[in-house]
Amino acid sequence: MRSHYCGDVNRSHVGEEVTLVGWVNRSRDLGGVVFLDLRDREGVIQVVYDPDLPEVFDVASTLRSEFCVQVKGLVRARPDSQINDQMRTGEIEVLGKALTILNSAPALPINMDKNQHNTEEQRLKYRYLDLRRPEMAERIIFRSKVTSAVRRFLDGNGFLDIETPILTKATPEGARDYLVPSRTYKGQFFALPQSPQLFKQLLMMSGFDRYYQIVKCFRDEDLRADRQPEFTQIDIETSFMTSAQVMDKTEEMVRGLFKELLNVDLGEFPKMTFAEAMRRYGSDKPDLRNPLELVDVADLVKDVDFKVFQEPANDSEGRVAVLCVPGGASLSRKQLDEYGKYVNIYGAKGLAWMKVNELENGLEGIQSPVLKFLSEEVVKGILERTGAANGDLILFGADKANIVAEAMGALRLKVGEDFDLLQGDWKPLWVVDFPMFERTSDGGLHAMHHPFTAPSGITPAELEADPTAAISDAYDMVLNGCELGGGSVRIYDAEMQSAVFRILGINDEEAQEKFGFLLEALKYGTPPHAGLAFGLDRMVMLMTGASSIRDVMAFPKTTTAACPLTNAPGFANPVQLEELGVSVVEAKKEQE
């Protein structure tokens, strides 16, 4: 039905007859000539119909937006005065000779020109229309190019594309599982996989030493802009490779993606330890485009007569840190109060500040509500350590170290955006040397990555003796403040795996029930292995500049995990529930 895609026709086709199909992007009658913008997935081209062919002209005059049509005509160059540099096909147009309406369209329920006139609910309900818009089509096509390039790279490096089960067993991976009731085993449930973690480890034990899969994963968790109940991972696992080798290979892949698809040279990725990232940026996924850093001043304020500073400065679990904001002294009290409210969201009780007006005038050149509690020596020490200059603003965080990191890390990002401080387009890095475990709110321990991550250079006995001191052989790839992917060397010794389970409060009986197959498999010559998983949706979101992963997925869910297009989820047929042995305790349909 077509000879070319609309967006592929160019000056080299002048004088040729072409057959095009697509949708009417826009139609206008200007002085007895109909100009038709025809759109398909590759772009838009202008088609011209004049009255010399009255039957065709009359049909063209009836066209409206989103009619599906076939066009036949002659490619000709536009006059210089009519060249449109904003269109890929702007140097040419098609003189229409024939026109067939393949399907009509009623008045549209969404605006096809600018999505700011549509709510997200509207866009998702009429997703098949939304995806026709060029910016959306470009993102979906770009996503396809990413997966194609990933497959070429991994195939070329000896990786095997192997599928793993979707119906599997629930394992504790940090989020709630989506459960699927079994009809043949009443009262028992499959779980949709949060990741293929255990199966890809089993593949290493099976001798397939280089595996990959572009795979759907499922997590029943609270959603935000970069989370979905179902998402896609680029999942990679290798045997007989160290963490450094895995990092080198996957970095090579990502650098190749950016060069091939964006013509961007990322350069070699720097490495930073978890401890350094938290100390300098308050985050284990720092955005290095932002030049602001947290500066510790606890030693300077530990003796001041101000409990807000003094107590955390003398607490082994506390921290006092500051941000120095260039030019920030111009902020009003109201603006500073807004920043105070912002850090409240992250658990901070308040935000002390200090304006540097005239350094040369000592304390008289400093403005701060807490200045009366600080000696000239303390103020001088803070100014010297931060490198503050006239016109700068110093913001204080003082609390438990984790609260200071979270609140001041978030404030750092907000201030960086507000003051337009971001430098450069792309700043990747590796974050390494994560703690094996972190404390939970009830005082227990939780695996910082997952329970199958190997510790670095430690025996099972040493790990159990002091688990909070253990460092994992794990690594995260971070780009512009987003975690692109994370991975680790895996535990390949049954004794070490059992030790980790015990530390996490999983006794031997529970471990056998949930992970007996893994512990058994570990006994049979399991090779050293390591891997990494990339979030494909997030990667494409960053590479395309989209504001949400929903804009790079064909059919995403809303932030309430619903699909307005299909009205999923829905109520099950009572007969089906009876067959499954499932009864609904309570179901309340939300009122529209």
Swiss-Prot record:
InterPro entries from the UniProt entry: Aa-tRNA-synt_II (IPR004364), aa-tRNA-synth_II (IPR006195), aa-tRNA-synth_II/BPL/LPL (IPR045864), Asp-tRNA-ligase_1 (IPR004524), Asp-tRNA-ligase_1_N (IPR047089), Asp/Asn-tRNA-synth_IIb (IPR002312), AspRS_core (IPR047090), GAD-like_sf (IPR004115)
PROSITE patterns given in the database record: AA_TRNA_LIGASE_II (PS50862)
Catalytic activity: tRNA(Asp) + L-aspartate + ATP = L-aspartyl-tRNA(Asp) + AMP + diphosphate
Cell compartments where the protein resides: Cytoplasm
Keyword Electron transport applies: no
Statement: the UniProt record of this protein carries the keyword ATP-binding: yes
Keywords recorded for this protein, A-Z: Aminoacyl-tRNA synthetase, ATP-binding, Cytoplasm, Ligase, Nucleotide-binding, Protein biosynthesis
Recorded GO CC terms: cytoplasm
Binding positions for L-aspartate per the UniProt entry: E173, R219, H449, R490
GO terms, molecular function: aspartate-tRNA ligase activity; ATP binding; nucleic acid binding
NCBIfam families with a match to the protein in the record: aspS_bact, PRK00476.1
HAMAP family in alphabetical order: Asp_tRNA_synth_type1
Quaternary structure note: Homodimer.
UniProt name for this protein: Aspartate--tRNA ligase
Organism: Shewanella loihica (strain ATCC BAA-1088 / PV-4)
